[in-house]
Amino acid sequence: MPSQKIISALAEIESSASPQNKLQLYNDLLSETVSASPEPQLADDLIYYLDSVLSEDLSIVAARPILDSFIYTLRKLSSETQIKVAQHAVNLLQSRSASVEEQDAQIREILADAYEAEEEYIAAARALQGIHIDSSQRLVSDSAKVKLWIRIVRLYLEEDDTTSAEAFLNRIKNLPSKIEDHELKLHFRLSQARIQDARRRFLDASQEYFAVSLAAGVDESDRLQALAAAIRCAVLAPAGPQRSRTLATLYKDDRATSVEEFGILEKMFLDRLLTPEEVSAFAQRLAPHQLAQTADGTTVLDKAVVEHNLVAASKLYENIKTDALGAILGLQASGDLTAGEKAEAYAARMVEQGRLSGSIDQIDGIIYFESNTTATGRHIRQWDAGVQGLSEGVERVATNIAEGHLVR
């Protein structure tokens, strides 16, 4: 409830016959209210003050400079007071926003800052969503739109709301102009990686994280975090030629040995069998969404490890009984399926999808692998990875020069 003092002061200003005097009187009262009202009372007094400024008795032309002074003052207040007052302000401005779009945008930005300070990220994002960007009254450049939408995306991602985040990321993709600002481009790629990661598009996410880890102007510790995220996503991706290429790119990066994920990366790249202990240690570094169960009751990690170990087994054996393969893969019988039948199902799906070369004799329960790569060929693959790394490095240098970036 507003104080009696501000009620009386505003009544006196509203009854003043001279519009020229009102601007100064409103500004003087605002300064006096902020300096004299105690914190718990201040929000109520400012809300009552706003009601007077935005009443029908005062034209919007006269109200605009008063609003500008009010916004300047609002920036200096506590986040709690800002939320109460700014939320009331944007509600009042909805009916008159066409005439005060710039002031409405500034108040919404203050409101978003306050919500973010209180870790209310969804509320902050929604406050920013209300900013008018396609209007004849207020011209907004594509660069400013990108900056606004990137912030909204990041706020939604703070609460793992990937659906809302992706909707605004798609708006950026649909802009006719490219993102020129390096920092905005970096935030875009990182946001895209996080969304793809959450949607379990792990190969795409790995590539985006890796690109961020190579970007100029990023702190070294953040680069390594992005590289570690790229490795985790590559490990979780379905086994196959595309993942093998991604693993090779990550493995030949000189920085890979600096992150904890290097051990599992090396074993996967060299097609070595993973032990349950190694998988358990790796699982502790995964995010909750990366450990969520799928429809069949397994996790993405469980499936990725089984498929990897199946590929690793194909490098060790020319053929193997399905029951023996089930034991190697650590599969357990459940329901009507034996461990061998589960192993056969995994192998059949991978062969059908072209991610494993081989054939299955269902009558004898034997899987025949077709592979020209044996365990002794690992050094050749390491050599190939080195050559590939050199080629990609040269290409990256050429790209950086073409884009005008410093070569790091």
UniProtKB/Swiss-Prot annotation:
It comes from the Eukaryota. Belongs to the CSN4 family. It is found in: Cytoplasm; Nucleus. Residues 194-374 form the PCI domain. Component of the COP9 signalosome (CSN) complex. InterPro entries: PCI_dom (IPR000717), PSMD12-CSN4-like_N (IPR054559), PSMD12/CSN4 (IPR040134), WH-like_DNA-bd_sf (IPR036388), WH_DNA-bd_sf (IPR036390). Its main location: cytoplasm. Keywords: Cytoplasm, Nucleus, Signalosome. PANTHER family: 26S PROTEASOME NON-ATPASE REGULATORY SUBUNIT 12/COP9 SIGNALOSOME COMPLEX SUBUNIT 4 (PTHR10855), COP9 SIGNALOSOME COMPLEX SUBUNIT 4 (PTHR10855:SF2). The lineage of its organism: Eukaryota, Fungi, Dikarya, Ascomycota, Pezizomycotina. This is COP9 signalosome complex subunit 4. Component of the COP9 signalosome (CSN) complex that acts as an regulator of the ubiquitin (Ubl) conjugation pathway by mediating the deneddylation of the cullin subunit of SCF-type E3 ubiquitin-protein ligase complexes. The CSN complex seems to link protein degradation to sexual development. Required for fruit body formation. One of its GO terms (cellular component) is cytoplasm.
